[in-house]
Amino acid sequence: MTNSIRIGTRKSPLALIHTNLVIQQIKQFFPDINCEIVPIITSGDLIQNKPLYDIGGKALFLKEIEQALLDKKIDLAVHSLKDVPGRIPEPLVIAAVLEREDPRDVFVCLKYKSIEELPQNAVIGSSAVRRKAFIQKIRPDLKVTVFRGNVDSRIKKLMTGEVDATILAYTGLKRLEVFNPEYCHLIEYSQMLPCIGQGVIAVEIRKDDNAMLEICNQINHLPTFELIKPERAFLEYLDANCRTPIAAYSQYLDANPRHLSKLAYREVFEGNTEALATAAYKSNRTDASTGLTYKLPLEVEFGKMSNIQTNFMLGNLDGSKITFHTETTNIKTSTEAGIKAAKMMLEAICK
């Protein structure tokens, strides 16, 4: 086991918060490991005056960080999963995620509490084509203008009257401690599906780095890791970019995902904690989606008792046509469900 880890991340306040959350998890299992944060300025951070879809998409927030990982200048990278494209360059892999936070979007406005309440022809600041598609579906009269920058800068633009409202991710507002219920209003999933992977912090490593894999095995939140598979499969199959209105949100139907592993263990071993400790490392399990082998075979057995429901959204490039689809599947076939939804919805959009 290594004594020190170099952790690559963006320099934004939110990215550094995410990185420190990962470090907290690492320290729980490996208290003696020294964690060095390596801040990296990405192309996406530097170019703020153009929409992401005009300059290469969200991958610009990863490019320099992934290159540092490939060059072995860092040992692992921390990302917001919503920024990670469906296809990751070899030999890199998302090997761990932290428990998902509330992935809903937030309507941020000083005078009104919802998109419906905005006056005719009001201006909403948002660069995300997903949000633009939902906004125009709800209120076709509203003007959606390009709105780049970090959370603080966007809120400042709102306060100075540059726009009438904006839409931001709840998790970012919460983690930065700037969620204010006086002008921040949660948007329900039925009105606006979140970005794929929203609310999830992801850890990326090189596949052949066994030391980092061991760490990821320990900190990985398996219920979340399984939950995002249909969302990510949907994204990967479509090879979607920032020009494509796309969304998906998965949830467990059978139990609280925080407790699924414990429930499964209790079912199998009837509370025999000594047997649990022995059996947890009894054999290996290879994850088909990553090719990685995890030494946590029984914990993932919660899949036998858990169904996942995923709501998908796909729009055409100009957002004039949007289709929705829902898949309910056993956890073991959730990746296939994402691919199935992508095929069906792509056909519907192209008609």
Swiss-Prot record:
InterPro entries: HemC, Porphobilin_deaminase_cofac_BS, Porphobilin_deaminase_N, Porphobilinogen_deaminase_C, Porphobilinogen_deaminase_C_sf, RPE1. It catalyses: 4 porphobilinogen + H2O = hydroxymethylbilane + 4 NH4(+). Keywords: Porphyrin biosynthesis, Transferase. PROSITE patterns: PORPHOBILINOGEN_DEAM. Its EC number is 2.5.1.61. Belongs to the HMBS family. Tetrapolymerization of the monopyrrole PBG into the hydroxymethylbilane pre-uroporphyrinogen in several discrete steps. The porphobilinogen subunits are added to the dipyrromethane group. PANTHER family: PORPHOBILINOGEN DEAMINASE (PTHR11557:SF0). This is Porphobilinogen deaminase. It comes from Rickettsia rickettsii (strain Sheila Smith). The gene is hemC.
